[in-house]
């Protein structure tokens, strides 16, 4: 329907020389990339239809050689640092420090500061952003509006009950990643605070109280918006200890999250993957892959086998939602009925039984040449089980070949 109506409304649209999509392209902003005037930057490059659908030249990023070289330098510097600590963040002995993947922040994935800062609305998450310097609280209060602060000044660290997150102003507007890492990246791993110290309210250290008083003084002189933010942070400090006691105070989102985690913890022991006796589909033929040895002159997983779908290689009958069997299989699980000549055969010459066309003389050369001495081979040591005697393919409930040693 929608296609028809589009055709009717634009009957003579010529996409090749039409500038419509260029001018009215979709725009996309990320939260905090802004102009000098403070307006959010729009990326017009994305979601734009090409004039010529086969011309990809406009999609390519211009290669910024200076930026790439800057990142390479920083990778080498920081890997030297890691080497001094006897810590190799890359577990590959052939690591090439000159290799820079696209969109690299100068670190292999999982290491280095995290540059994807979240918006303030996301403050309920597990992590909070805190600075690592000695006078942490001082700097946090004083320079919360400092837009020149490099990203590496803040690092993700596990929350200890607080709901503190960076004020939006403290997130740097624009910074070249390469420059800032080398100056400010601190390689020391932050030591997480123990829960015991947090749960017991202690008198705050004098340095912290000083800084808080300083911040309160400065807040009086500053605008009301700043004071609101500082009061938020002070609230979060006071709530550290009360959060565990009063669960009703926390938001509904956080409750849901804890509930989910609890669920996950309870479900941990259950198997969600198919069991070993479930139906194994036939292996597809992969080009260049060596063929399976032809144990039975026709392998059980060979889809070209005319007898493949005769039913004996199906899994155990599945249960329906009402716990009834969907279809009853006469030959469900035969664990080797020793008295039944159909299922138990100690003689490897199958021509009498027609279960498997089989060459007993060739058997040990194909299957067990590295284990058994062919001169000493005794076929009486092996017994076969088959789920359905009329079928040439062994039952997949017992694996690809139904041979088990008769100990």
From Swiss-Prot:
Instruction: Cite the residue spans of the region called Disordered.
Output: 1-64, 110-276, 314-341
Q: Which domain of life is it from?
A: Viruses
List all Basic residues biased stretches. Answer: 232-246, 259-270, 316-341
Q: Which residues form the signal peptide?
A: none
Acidic residues bias locations: 122-137
Q: Where is the composition biased (Polar residues)?
A: 7-32, 138-147, 184-201
Residue spans of biased composition, Low complexity class = 209-231
Q: Where is there biased composition of kind Basic and acidic residues?
A: 33-44, 247-258
Q: What is this protein called?
A: Uncharacterized protein L645
This chain's source organism reads Acanthamoeba polyphaga mimivirus (APMV)
